[in-house]
Amino acid sequence: MSSVVIEVADLDVYYGTSQILFGVGLSVRQGETMALLGRNGAGKSTTMKAIMGLAPPRRGKVSLRGALISGRKPHHIARAGLGFVPEDRQIFPEHTVEDNLVIGKKRGPEGQDEWPIKRIYEVFPLLEPLRHRIAGRLSGGEQQMLAIARTLMGNPALLLLDEPSEGLAPIIVQRIGELLRQLRSIGSTVLIAEQNMHFCLGLASHATIIDKGQIVYAAGIDELKANEAIRRRYLAL
C-alpha cells in the first residue's frame, strides 16, 4: 500500500467566535487524486487554508509524510512540500508567463527537481507559445493553467487546488480536467477542493464530502458514482 502524504486529524477551526470546522479528518496517499467535495460554504476552502497554515486550527493536527506541520507558518509549510493554488490564483500579472514560472522554481524538500521548465511545457503545451506574454493579459483558463504550472515548479509532495474550475467556461474546465487526469497518470498527489462534482468524478481517484464543517462521507470515486443517495443529499444544488 502506498504511503500517506498528508494526514489531517480532528481539526477545529474558528473565524473569530464562529466555529467553521468540526473535527475534520482526511488523508491522501501517494499518487492519489482526492476530491474534497461539498456545497458552497461547506468548509472546503477553510480546510485547505487550515492545511496551509492560513487558518490555524484551535484543535487537531496536520502531518506531511509523518512530520507535524500544523502550527507552522505558511511559508515553512510550503517549503516542507505543499504547493497551494488558491481560488484567486495569485499569479504575478505584470510579469511574463515564463517569468512567473521561474519565480516559482525551487527544488523539493529532498532536493528533487521533477519539474524542470522543459517538462512543464510538455505537460502544459498551451503555455509554451504564450511564454513571453504578460500574465495579466491571459484568459482566466490560461491563468489557471499558469498558476498550477508555477506551483508544480516548486516540486511539491502534494498539490492543493482550491476550486480550480470556478468561473471558467465549460471548454476550459474540460481542459483543466484533462490536465489533472494527466497529472494523476504520472503519479502526482493532488487534493482538490471543488463544488463542481461532475468535474471531479472524471478525474479523482477518491472523494471526501464535507457538509456544514464536518466530514460526512469518504470513499473511492467509483463508490461515490454508484451512490446516488449520497450525491443527492450532500452535493445536489
Regions found by a protein language model. Give the residues of each.
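Catalytic Walker B motif of ABC-type/P-loop ATPase nucleotide-binding domains
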Residues: L159-E163
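The feature captures the beta-strand-to-loop junction immediately N-terminal to the Walker
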Residues: L37-R39
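ABC ATPase C-loop
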Residues: T151-L152
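Helix-to-loop junction immediately C-terminal to a conserved catalytic motif
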Residues: M52
